Amino acid sequence: MSPQDKLVIALPKGRILDEAMPLVRAAGILPEPAFDDPKSRLLRFGTNHPHIDIIRVRSFDVATFVAFGAAHLGVAGNDVLMEFDYPEIYAPLDLGIGACRLSVAEPDDLAASDDPRRWSHVRIATKYPEVTKRHFAARGVQAECVKLNGAMELAPSLGLCTRIVDLVSSGATLKANGLKEVEVLAEVTSRLIVNRAALKTRPDEMAGWIEAFRKACGG
């Protein structure tokens, strides 16, 4: 079978991968040994199914690989799905992993007297400009977003932006940087995502794997 004919599953690097792999294995997909080798520089891996490969990419890129058909299935947080809003993606299953929230945070001294309900214009550092703008536009608040890909917590102390929008889990990073969570935009978990075209061209195969992941989640 040529590489172009294989079913490709896109998985995110990092913490979510650790939570996703028990579900992937429970669904019956076992990657080759190099997948678990921290020294391996491979990004594409074979599995116990000769017609299935796994690729390991940045979390924000999983949705793009699936939307454009380079991968057929993937695991992505609904934060990423909301930001890109790809019509080519179908998300049939909440995997219940990677739980966190997308929140607004600001310096502790400002949060002590601030009221988010009174905001009319905000300048925000975030990796999620589209989600942020939509959220505040729905409240009639103008949001000026400065796009950053990391180290969001530095923005207020360096005068770049007064507030940030970022993923929050325990809140420990915010606290360590003198910031306080003041508003939640969305609760976030990771979803199984599917390319809609693949659903039409490989319906039985795709439906079978969706069901396998559903059972792996206890459904």
Swiss-Prot record:
It holds the Pfam family HisG. Disulfide bonds: none annotated. GO terms for biological process: L-histidine biosynthetic process. InterPro entries: ATP_PRibTrfase_cat (IPR013820), ATP_PRibTrfase_HisG (IPR001348), ATP_PRibTrfase_HisG_short (IPR024893). It is an enzyme of class 2 (transferase). Keywords: Amino-acid biosynthesis, ATP-binding, Cytoplasm, Glycosyltransferase, Histidine biosynthesis, Nucleotide-binding, Transferase. It is found in: Cytoplasm. One of its GO terms (cellular component) is cytoplasm. It catalyses: 1-(5-phospho-beta-D-ribosyl)-ATP + diphosphate = 5-phospho-alpha-D-ribose 1-diphosphate + ATP. Its EC number is 2.4.2.17. Pathway: Amino-acid biosynthesis; L-histidine biosynthesis; L-histidine from 5-phospho-alpha-D-ribose 1-diphosphate: step 1/9. Belongs to the ATP phosphoribosyltransferase family. Short subfamily. Catalyzes the condensation of ATP and 5-phosphoribose 1-diphosphate to form N'-(5'-phosphoribosyl)-ATP (PR-ATP). Has a crucial role in the pathway because the rate of histidine biosynthesis seems to be controlled primarily by regulation of HisG enzymatic activity. Heteromultimer composed of HisG and HisZ subunits. Lacks the C-terminal regulatory region which is replaced by HisZ. This is ATP phosphoribosyltransferase. The gene is hisG.
